[in-house]
């Protein structure tokens, strides 16, 4: 891929063709990937967090798998594998495919939270503060 990816205006929710270097049961090869890093990180880091998509619709009842219909701009009906986040260089990004609508991003966020269950360690009284910080990290910088 091209190093010009470091200058792209990447946003959480964007789907790109991505080269995954998986081994074993990990996703590998070129496939769609969902940018799942906050926008401040996307702007300043040479790396980003991506969730792989697959068109092999298996284990559809798993709470960490989110169905995405092809009508959002994909070639095939797909699933986001929320339990498989990958940190990778922006150089592994290929062409832009589409941006996931917010209704699906909400489902992906829940799937990702459930994949680690880390939310169980947060005091419920702090959840609003965490949510506000997340909103700030996704604000579009001008």
Where are these regions (language model features)?
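C-terminal terminal-subdomain/extension
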Residues: 2-8, 72-142
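Compact nucleic-acid interaction/catalytic patches
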Residues: 26-30, 35-70
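Short, charged beta-turn/beta-strand-edge "cap" motif at the junction between a beta-strand
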Residues: 21-24
């Amino acid at each position: 891929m091209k190093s010009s990816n470091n200058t792209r205006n990447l946003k959480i929710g964007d789907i790109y063709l991505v080269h995954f270097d998986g081994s074993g049961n990990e996703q590998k090869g070129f496939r769609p990937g969902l940018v799942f890093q906050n926008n401040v990180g996307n702007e300043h880091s040479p790396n980003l967090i991506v969730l792989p998509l697959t068109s092999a619709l298996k284990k559809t009842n798993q709470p960490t798998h989110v169905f995405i219909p092809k009508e959002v701009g994909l070639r095939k009906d797909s699933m986001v594998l929320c339990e498989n986040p990958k940190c990778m260089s922006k150089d592994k990004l290929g062409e832009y495919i589409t941006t996931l609508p917010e209704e699906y991003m909400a489902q992906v966020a829940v799937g990702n939270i459930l994949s680690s269950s880390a939310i169980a360690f947060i005091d419920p009284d702090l959840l609003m503060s965490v949510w506000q910080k997340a909103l700030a990290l996704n604000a579009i910088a001008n």
